[in-house]
Amino acid sequence: MNNLLTKLEQALGMSDTGSLNGLDYEFNPIPGDVEVVQVAIKDREELPIYLTQSDSQMICICYLWDDTEVIPAKRAEMMEVMLDMNIPMPLSSFGRIGQRYAIFGALSIDSSADDIARELTVLSDNALDAIEAMSEYLN
């Protein structure tokens, strides 16, 4: 867990909280076999970002909504819109993990602290934009 946490500390310049691009961050390691750090941004706490890594890449994931929140009659149209939105959001992509829709981005394991911080900010901004764009498909 320390390797990923150390990179976050370098990226945000603190031990467990800090500010970047006018946003205040807080992060917490999540216990388990896989190294995961939850990153919460002030005033966006309902959309935490989960950061994990493998031998070759880091993945940042932000869960957006649950499958039960999708209006059934609009599901197919929503999926089409999500596919269309992947192109204008080149640093983030839509996905689904179990019954939860998510937006995610990937970085090289060798990414700089600045790159990690930038990805967290971009992913958070894109998550807010995605929820706004998809609101007509959700209960």
Task: Identify what each model region corresponds to.
Residues 1-48, 88, 96:
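Charge-rich, low-complexity N-terminal segments
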Residues 2-9, 13, 76-83, 131, ...:
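Generic detector of well-ordered alpha-helical segments enriched in charged/polar residues
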Residues 3-4, 70-78, 115-122, 126:
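Short amphipathic alpha-helical segments
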Residues 14-29, 57-75:
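Charged, low-complexity, helix/coiled-coil-prone segments
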Residues 34-35, 58, 101-102:
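Hydrophobic residues embedded in beta-strands of well-ordered beta-sheets
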Residues 38-65:
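Short N-terminal mixed-charge amphipathic segments
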Residues 59-100:
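Short, internal acidic amphipathic alpha-helical interface segments
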Residues 90-121, 125-128, 132-139:
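Well-ordered alpha/beta subsegment
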